[in-house]
């Protein structure tokens, strides 16, 4: 991930998408569905078009937004996790920690809540959607379907 100090990494500008699109292209060429981008110190920053979460020991862990756009979906997942009593940590994640995670998933407008099966051909957890990812995914889908009154403020109904 291109560091903020080399440009305007926190601006939602067309020029900032080139790095992500090239990473996605390289990932697809290598046989993967998505790319994980790392910051200038080698920690996971985000996916090419989504935020990244892992689950370890019952807690959600997601990188800070030091070098990425702030995400409404990421913030919503953090809020839903609090409602579900799931602890959330905002801290750096090493590539090696991803390999030993219990679960992992992407979040974003297009990704919504997408479970991750493997990273670098290493199976994450049991190799399928884990129980915490399932809880978060279910709560998120209820939210966007208007089934959770607490989050009605997030919805705009269109006739």
Residue spans of the language-model regions?
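Helix-start/capping segments and mature chain N-termini
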Residues: 1-159
